[in-house]
Amino acid sequence: MSSAHFNRGPAYGLSAEVKNKLAQKYDHQREQELREWIEGVTGRRIGNNFMDGLKDGIILCEFINKLQPGSVKKVNESTQNWHQLENIGNFIKAITKYGVKPHDIFEANDLFENTNHTQVQSTLLALASMAKTKGNKVNVGVKYAEKQERRFEPEKLREGRNIIGLQMGTNKFASQQGMTAYGTRRHLYDPKLGTDQPLDQATISLQMGTNKGASQAGMTAPGTKRQIFEPGLGMEHCDTLNVSLQMGSNKGASQRGMTVYGLPRQVYDPKYCLNPEYPELSEPTHNHHPHNYYNSA
């Protein structure tokens, strides 16, 4: 079996874009701090390339054995690929037992195949934070918050019952009885007040409450004629056949004698104009003047 590492082809498209974004999150200052911490604990040099020095898993196994003795029983010094992957797997199992959360731990291929160095760095920082909670003097990472457990005596717990809350007391027996659903009608009626009950339950008025028996009886559709006539007043009936320009009575006027629009109109009245007298045909026409054809008297 060849000792060469597994080779992965270059990434293209979306894979290359994701890889570049992960590489941009890598913190080189944190890398230097982790290098100094690991080299100081193990006493071994990692090399110029930080991730290549950790890829065989030997330094990682020795490092966790320093933090927690006996975490990794056997460290493989072989250069074979499966031996190196076994070392990385043993390191992952050891830091899980040490207390590092599973979602903070990298996968073996993230380090061995150089797919996600940012996650490897995050795992080492989480390991440093866990080491601080166990008493190790580490200048890397943030210390996890410790549990602050408190025990209270039963007498102390009973004292809490004497505290008056913001809504202590009685609500004077108020309840939501009689409440209607949002958007429904509300009848402003109380039998204690002695007011009349709402009669018309089918007509929705503009003002909530009772309409005192008023309804829409006799209302006509919008745009129809409105007859202004009241029998109680003793008025005569109006002409319902002709539509007048003004609502009400047109005093018997009609359109009788009206001609069709566009026809000539004869200005003639028999009271003022007499019947014309025409000359007889036997009389000579030269003895009569044109103005004698009509009797103007």
UniProtKB/Swiss-Prot annotation:
Modified residues (Phosphothreonine): 170, 180, 184, 259
Protein family: Belongs to the calponin family.
Record GO cellular component, one term: cytoskeleton
Transmembrane segments: none
Keywords: Actin-binding, Calmodulin-binding, Phosphoprotein, Repeat
Residue numbers carrying Phosphoserine: 175
Organism of origin: Mus musculus (Mouse)
A GO BP annotation: negative regulation of vascular associated smooth muscle cell proliferation
Protein role: Thin filament-associated protein that is implicated in the regulation and modulation of smooth muscle contraction. It is capable of binding to actin, calmodulin and tropomyosin. The interaction of calponin with actin inhibits the actomyosin Mg-ATPase activity.
Self-association state and partner proteins as the record states: Part of cGMP kinase signaling complex at least composed of ACTA2/alpha-actin, CNN1/calponin H1, PLN/phospholamban, PRKG1 and ITPR1.
Any single Pfam family the record assigns to this protein: CH
Tissue specificity statement from the Swiss-Prot or TrEMBL entry: Smooth muscle, and tissues containing significant amounts of smooth muscle.
Domain Calponin-homology (CH) residues, every copy: 28-131
Intervals holding Calponin-like repeats: 164-189, 204-229, 243-268
Name the record gives this protein: Calponin-1
GO-annotated molecular function: actin binding; calmodulin binding
